[in-house]
Amino acid sequence: MADNFNFELVSPERLLLSEMVTEVVVPATEGEMTVMANHAPTMTTIKPGVVSVRSASGKKQDYVVFGGFADILPTGCTLLAESAVPVEELHKDELTRRIEAARKELEHAELHEHKSRLEHFIMELTHLRGIVQQD
């Protein structure tokens, strides 16, 4: 049986989750990471994607995050998201709205680095839209 550790998922709007868990899968910018108790101390940036949380009771919960960073310690993990919602609360039309807003910003972007980041963000949101279920 896996050891438990404290996990918090925080966005500017609210604290989405604070509980003991056995496993958290985060969409780190360098690749998907599975965090468990006694993980080596790590800080990583988070890209838009799905965070999967397995609670101490065995229940699995998924959340959509739109970037941020995670602070991982042997005793816990805190994920500070730019924006986050439970996956069942997010609809494809919201993702489409975010994609269109990023495309409009891309039209007016002048710096190559800014354009490149926006193009990558649009690609990540488009992929995310493909995995979020429509009600």
From Swiss-Prot:
Membrane topology category: Peripheral membrane protein
Compartments where found: Cell inner membrane
Molecular-function GO term, any one: ATP binding
One cellular component term from this protein's GO annotations in UniProt: plasma membrane
Primary location group: membrane
Keywords for the protein's UniProt record, in alphabetical order: ATP synthesis, Cell inner membrane, Cell membrane, CF(1), Hydrogen ion transport, Ion transport, Membrane, Transport
Chain's role: Produces ATP from ADP in the presence of a proton gradient across the membrane.
PANTHER family assigned to the protein according to its UniProt record, in alphabetical order: ATP SYNTHASE DELTA/EPSILON CHAIN, ATP SYNTHASE EPSILON CHAIN, CHLOROPLASTIC
Family to which this protein belongs: Belongs to the ATPase epsilon chain family.
Quaternary state and interactors: F-type ATPases have 2 components, CF(1) - the catalytic core - and CF(0) - the membrane proton channel. CF(1) has five subunits: alpha(3), beta(3), gamma(1), delta(1), epsilon(1). CF(0) has three main subunits: a, b and c.
Record's protein name: ATP synthase epsilon chain
Organism: Rhizobium etli (strain ATCC 51251 / DSM 11541 / JCM 21823 / NBRC 15573 / CFN 42)
Lineage: Bacteria, Pseudomonadati, Pseudomonadota, Alphaproteobacteria, Hyphomicrobiales
